[in-house]
């Protein structure tokens, strides 16, 4: 029979329809015939064989069809066996059949498969796969070292199919099993119902074999299983099938959890985290690949079993070593930043290199690009932490413990010595980048309750910060994971042990963690930024000087400037990511609200309206660490310096900050630390409008802040609080209080000036002055009187110091210009240069401050006069003004003519103008004018004539010059009269003279402890600065002194007698 006849015969058989193709039916028939032949060959020959042979009487192919019909009991058996074989081939891309592809149909058969030769030999004549041998076949496939060498064509197609080769010959067994899992999933959706259990079984096989691969990876030669897992996830994230991979992993993880006899799940997965750690640590902030790895970790922190392994994996070897946390997987991530990896080393730094060669626009573009990556980076870290906190109580406890222990181990970052010894610092503690990123992520966690009216905000319980050491179980029960906060200095001393609750909410823990992280990170970086800024200025000045003098040091200075500028721009960029700053501002405004509510005794969850006078009951502040308030102030000052636009765009929330400043600046009962209260004045200066700044076209300048500041409901209390802290910092108890007070008062002058220009504040200040005028002799000197006394003290000291430094600078400049330094040794010359630079810095500081103090006196005296002309203050302010005029307009002025006034902020014209303004403001008062000539040290008619000449020279308005000339004439007339009187009273006995001032007493009083008699005005001035008896240092107040009526009457009788004698002589 021909092939054509054979095909026709088989095709006419009804069972042929069960096969995928005629070729399949023909192949099956051939196999069956061969098997029967082998069986007949093995049996002994029968004598009747030749006679009884049916095959001889039947056509060869008719016989084959008959055998097919007899071999299967039903159509279902034939169909299932063939379809299972095909399905297994499609899923696992393996086969036992290496027959001619032309004999196979392309229907339902993959184009390429791995031929399992050894297994085919072992099974001898079975060349199909079934559920009985598929597991063995899959295992054999997994053991092949190079499956690509075992590929065979399953179809007769000659078209090159690279994807089929790649899929079937996949060498990486983890990826291969995942692909099998996906193909099995697809089969489940397509196969008929009778094959569905077999498809599911194949799918389960991929999972169980993947579990085996992970449990015993050593069996599989040259297969890095864990690397393959990571690469598979990485590829999935970068593609669009991540959910498919995670579905597969979920089932594998479940299988691993159910079978931990060989290895625990943690042991299986730790190598995966090792790989991630090794890969991530070398990545940069702006590398896209970093974010793919972070997405992998995001999945792991969402998956409950992987998350448990993760929180165990990130535990440092030594929990007490702060730097060790940076070496963990989470720490390596947190250490990624645009900050320098090694402090001071800009080589190989990828950001802001050679900044002087970049335009401002190019630098802004780079900064904006980094900020985009930072925003994404912080979001990923935040999501990881959020996942761990929400996943389970176990992961929540573990991650909070990690954070608490980390902060405690790094608490030394705030120590003064740590900043002075950077080499040791970076060996002991985690980096600035670590804490900046951690702070940014924690800030995001706080945002849900960082709203001024949030009821959740007020559930914060400050007693959390007073808890002492707890064991791990207690921490878990109480939800307390921070350590060592009980050793922090709090806003006020605690009077008694607080009542601790059973446990604390997450709001309390989040706030404490975030604030302490900011204190360890942002706070320190801000200090560094200020220092870098100062160093840049100094380097710039030195560089320009070197260029002008053609010094060989110019190139070196330029290189130093470039390096430092790179550090500055990198640090500034890291700290000014807009979303982080906005989140931090939200937190700090909320903290202002919280502290205000605690300060007025609110222990509920709903805010109470602020009213003055403040109610009693603020004991909770005894458990609030100072760094809560310090962070608030530090951040707002940072914004003023480096990101002022945010203050303007968020102006509406600043009212809460003004509430905070008003309460705590003016209340030593609620904030004991005078240094911290003084810092709040700097905070006030930071948030108030600055009308002298260059307007930003993108922001409505200072309009919104001006509105908030001018419409502030508690303007009188704020003005009083500012003046109170100005006075209080005179005596802080610090050994450096004298130098500190000038720095603390620096921001207060512009605030006072701005307040004076606003009606509500100016009236409040005048009210304080009126009260002081009416209570000059109160037991405690009135606040405003003490303020004016200190203001004049400062003015006298500062301008006098500035004059001294300018005189020294003048001398040194002359020496240098004459060439006297040229003959000095290089070391001596350097010392001279350093000395000149130091004098310059000191002169500049004292000039700035003296300009402010004299300017403040000028505007205050425009409407406040009675206090200044009172004997308590008049003599002091007059002697001060005359002394300064003597140096500024008299013969001594030549000693102050340094080369460049602006370099030292020396403004003699402004000073002369302000001093003359004060004279004119107070000149209407007769007793003030009468007191001017009594200044025997500096006053002379010539001095005022010289002043008029200078006023003309500096082009002051004509009406001012005329007014001052008239005042000078009036004072000269009074001086002549006083000279005559002094001659009359020149021989007064010592009993009538003040023992301190050696002047005739007008109102003698007796001091209670020393029993010494002094003039009332003398002791009153003394007590403004020092409330002790000047003769024995005993405590003394004005209400304790007693008038010496008898002596006063004697003086008055003597004066009357002398006057009468003089009249008789005339």
From Swiss-Prot:
Pathway assigned to this chain's UniProt record: Protein modification; protein ubiquitination
Keyword Signal (UniProt): no
GO term, biological process aspect, one: ERAD pathway
CDD domains with a match to the protein in the record: RING-Ubox_UBE4A
Annotated region (Disordered), positions in chain: 33-57
Gene Ontology CC terms: cytoplasm; nucleus; ubiquitin ligase complex
Domain of life of the native organism: Eukaryota
Function: Ubiquitin-protein ligase that probably functions as an E3 ligase in conjunction with specific E1 and E2 ligases. May also function as an E4 ligase mediating the assembly of polyubiquitin chains on substrates ubiquitinated by another E3 ubiquitin ligase. Mediates 'Lys-48'-linked polyubiquitination of substrates.
Organism: Pongo abelii
One of the record's GO molecular function terms: ubiquitin-ubiquitin ligase activity
EC number assigned by the record: 2.3.2.27
The record's note on its domains: The U-box domain is required for the ubiquitin protein ligase activity.
Compartment(s) where it occurs, according to its Swiss-Prot or TrEMBL record: Cytoplasm
Keywords in alphabetical order: Acetylation, Cytoplasm, Transferase, Ubl conjugation pathway
Domain named U-box: residues: 987-1061
Gene3D superfamilies in the record: Zinc/RING finger domain, C3HC4 (zinc finger)
Reactions catalysed, as given in the entry: S-ubiquitinyl-[E2 ubiquitin-conjugating enzyme]-L-cysteine + [acceptor protein]-L-lysine = [E2 ubiquitin-conjugating enzyme]-L-cysteine + N(6)-ubiquitinyl-[acceptor protein]-L-lysine
Sites of N6-acetyllysine modification: 386
Family per similarity comment: Belongs to the ubiquitin conjugation factor E4 family.
Protein name: Ubiquitin conjugation factor E4 A
């Amino acid at each position: 029979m021909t092939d054509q006849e054979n095909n026709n015969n088989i095709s006419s058989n009804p069972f042929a329809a069960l096969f995928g193709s005629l070729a399949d039916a023909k192949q099956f028939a051939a196999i069956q015939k061969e098997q029967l032949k082998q069986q007949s060959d093995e049996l002994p020959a029968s004598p009747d064989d030749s006679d009884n042979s049916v095959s001889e009487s039947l056509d060869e192919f008719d016989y084959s069809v008959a055998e097919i019909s007899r071999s299967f009991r039903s159509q279902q058996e034939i169909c299932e066996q063939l379809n299972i074989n095909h399905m297994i081939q499609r899923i696992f891309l393996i086969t036992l059949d290496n027959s001619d592809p032309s004999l196979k149909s392309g229907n339902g058969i993959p184009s390429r498969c791995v031929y399992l030769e050894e297994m085919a030999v072992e099974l001898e004549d079975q060349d199909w796969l079934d559920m009985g041998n598929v597991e063995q076949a899959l295992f054999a496939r997994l053991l092949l070292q190079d499956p690509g060498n075992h590929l065979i064509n399953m179809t007769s197609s000659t078209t090159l199919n690279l994807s089929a080769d790649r899929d079937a010959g996949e060498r990486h067994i983890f990826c291969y099993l995942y692909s099998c899992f996906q193909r099995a999933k697809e089969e489940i959706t397509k196969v008929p119902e009778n094959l569905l259990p077999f498809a599911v079984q194949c799918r389960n096989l991929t999972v169980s074999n993947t579990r085996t691969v992970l449990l015993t990876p050593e069996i599989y030669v040259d297969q890095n299983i864990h690397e393959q897992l990571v690469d598979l996830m990485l590829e999935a994230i970068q593609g669009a099938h991540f959910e498919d991979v995670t579905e597969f992993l979920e089932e594998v993880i479940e299988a691993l959890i159910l079978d931990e006899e060989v290895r625990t799940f943690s042991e299986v997965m730790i190598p995966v985290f090792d790989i991630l750690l090794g890969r991530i640590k070398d990545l940069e902030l702006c590398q896209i690949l970093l974010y793919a790895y972070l997405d992998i970790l995001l999945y792991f922190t969402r998956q409950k079993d992987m998350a448990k392994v993760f929180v165990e994996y990130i535990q440092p070897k030594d929990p007490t070593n702060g730097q060790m946390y940076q070496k963990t997987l989470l720490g390596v991530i947190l250490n990624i930043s645009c900050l320098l990896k090694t402090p001071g080393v800009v080589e190989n730094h990828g950001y802001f290199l050679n900044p002087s060669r970049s335009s401002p626009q190019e630098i802004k573009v780079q900064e904006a690009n980094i900020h985009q990556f930072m925003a994404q980076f912080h979001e990923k870290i935040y999501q990881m932490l959020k996942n761990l906190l929400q996943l389970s109580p176990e992961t929540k406890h573990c991650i909070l413990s990690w954070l608490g222990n980390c902060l405690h181990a790094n608490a030394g970052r705030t120590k003064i010595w740590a900043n002075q010894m950077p080499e040791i610092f970076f060996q002991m503690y985690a980096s600035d980048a670590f804490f900046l990123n951690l702070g940014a992520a924690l800030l995001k966690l706080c945002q849900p309750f960082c709203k001024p009216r949030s009821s959740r905000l007020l559930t914060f319980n400050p007693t959390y910060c007073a808890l002492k050491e707890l064991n791990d179980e207690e921490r878990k029960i109480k939800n307390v994971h921070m350590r060592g906060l009980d050793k922090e200095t709090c806003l006020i001393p605690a009077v008694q042990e607080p009542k601790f609750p059973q446990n604390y909410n997450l709001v309390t823990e989040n706030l404490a963690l975030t604030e302490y992280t900011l204190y360890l990170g942002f706070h320190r970086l801000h200090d560094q930024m200020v220092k870098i800024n100062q160093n840049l200025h100094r380097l710039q000045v030195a560089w320009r000087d070197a260029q002008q003098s053609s010094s060989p040091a110019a190139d070196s200075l330029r290189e130093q400037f470039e390096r430092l500028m790179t550090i500055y721009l990198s640090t500034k960029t890291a700290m000014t990511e807009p979303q982080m700053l906005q989140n931090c501002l939200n937190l700090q405004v909320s903290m202002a609200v919280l502290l205000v509510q605690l300060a007025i005794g609110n222990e509920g969850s709903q805010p109470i309206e602020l009213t003055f006078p403040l109610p009693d009951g603020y004991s909770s502040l005894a458990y609030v660490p100072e760094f809560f308030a310090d962070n608030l102030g530090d951040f707002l000052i940072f914004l003023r310096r480096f990101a002022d636009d945010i203050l303007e765009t968020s102006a509406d929330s600043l009212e809460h900050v003004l509430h905070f400043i008003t309460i705590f600046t003016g209340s030593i009962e609620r904030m004991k630390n005078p240094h911290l209260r003084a810092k709040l004045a700097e905070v006030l200066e930071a948030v108030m409008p600055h009308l002298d700044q260059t307007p930003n076209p993108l922001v409505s300048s200072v309009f919104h802040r001006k509105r908030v500041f001018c419409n502030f409901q508690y303007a009188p209390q704020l003005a009083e609080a500012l003046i109170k802290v100005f006075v209080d910092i005179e005596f802080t108890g610090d050994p450096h209080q004298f130098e500190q007070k000038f720095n603390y008062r620096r921001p207060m002058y512009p605030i006072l000036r701005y307040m004076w220009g606003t009606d509500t504040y100016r009236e409040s200040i005048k009210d304080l002055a009126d009260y002081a005028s009416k209570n000059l002799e109160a037991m405690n000197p009135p606040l405003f009187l003490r303020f004016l006394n200190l203001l004049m003290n400062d003015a006298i000291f500062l301008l006098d110091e500035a004059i001294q430094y300018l005189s020294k600078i003048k001398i040194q400049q002359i020496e240098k210009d004459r060439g006297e330094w040229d003959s000095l040794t290089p070391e001596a010359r350097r010392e001279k240069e350093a000395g000149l630079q130091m004098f310059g810095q000191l002169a500049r500081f004292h000039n700035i401050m003296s300009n402010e103090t004299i300017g403040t006196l000028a505007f205050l005296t425009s409407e406040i006069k009675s206090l200044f002309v009172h004997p308590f203050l008049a003599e002091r302010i007059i002697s001060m003004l005359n002394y300064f005029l003597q140096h500024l307009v008299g013969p001594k002025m030549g000693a102050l003519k340094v080369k460049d006034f602006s370099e030292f902020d020396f403004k003699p014209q402004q000073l002369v103008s302000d001093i003359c303004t004060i004279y004119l403001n107070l000149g209407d008062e007769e007793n003030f004018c009468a007191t001017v000539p009594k200044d025997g040290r500096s006053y002379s008619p010539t001095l005022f004539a010289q002043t008029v000449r200078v006023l003309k020279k500096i082009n002051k308005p004509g009406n001012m010059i005329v007014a001052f000339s008239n005042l000078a004439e009036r004072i000269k007339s009074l001086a002549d009269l006083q000279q005559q009187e002094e001659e009359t009273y020149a021989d007064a006995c010592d009993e009538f003279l003040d023992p301190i001032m050696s002047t005739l007493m007008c109102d003698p009083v007796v001091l209670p402890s020393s029993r010494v008699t002094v003039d009332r005005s003398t002791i009153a001035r003394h007590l403004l600065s020092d409330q002790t008896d000047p003769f024995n240092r005993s405590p003394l107040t004005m209400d304790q002194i007693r008038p010496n009526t008898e002596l006063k009457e004697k003086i008055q009788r003597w004066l009357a007698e002398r006057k009468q004698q003089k009249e008789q002589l005339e």
